A protein has these predicted regions:
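Flexible, glycine-rich phosphate/dinucleotide-binding loops
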Residues: 12, 41-43, 138-139
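Extreme N-terminal starter segment of soluble prokaryotic enzymes
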Residues: 1-4
Length: 143
């Protein structure tokens, strides 16, 4: 069994928990692979934008708090899902999954968990997608 540990590359906040999960699963005898979400769907511009926004928000924590108070809601997640669930990114994911085998995904950010679930369902794949919220101050997808 191979588990893909998916993170959003915006700093250490999602990578470190994904790495910890990967290390523990490996210690238990499960094969794992660390996966950058934006590389899976081949979206380098979103990857760069996400990193720049997060670094900017770290410099201005009050702005980050105000933005994320509204951004980390179910309605916002649905809008993001719609944006990423385009045919282009689904095709990129399909191409990636043809060349890379995983039996399940564990995501440390809510956006990849929603999008990979949607893509897997749309493509008729039976790949379970698990979400592990590594954000300390917010609980995503709750209104």
């Amino acid at each position: 069994m191979k588990i893909g540990c998916v993170y959003v590359n915006a700093g250490k906040g999602h990578y470190i928990p994904a790495k910890a999960i990967s290390d523990e699963l490996t210690a238990l005898g499960t094969e794992t692979e660390m996966l950058d979400f934006f590389k899976i769907i081949d979206a380098p511009k979103f990857d760069a934008l996400n990193q720049n926004i997060w670094r900017w928000e770290l410099k201005f924590p009050k702005i980050e708090q105000a933005l994320n108070a509204r951004a980390d809601k179910t309605s916002s997640a649905k809008k993001k899902l719609k944006a990423f669930a385009s045919a282009r990114y689904q095709k990129n994911f399909s191409r990636w999954i043809e060349n890379n085998h995983v039996d399940a995904f564990i995501c440390t950010h809510y956006i990849p968990s929603l999008i990979l679930s949607e893509f897997s369902h749309n493509l008729g794949l039976h790949i379970p997608v698990f979400a592990y919220s590594s954000d300390v101050f917010t609980t995503h997808c709750q209104d």
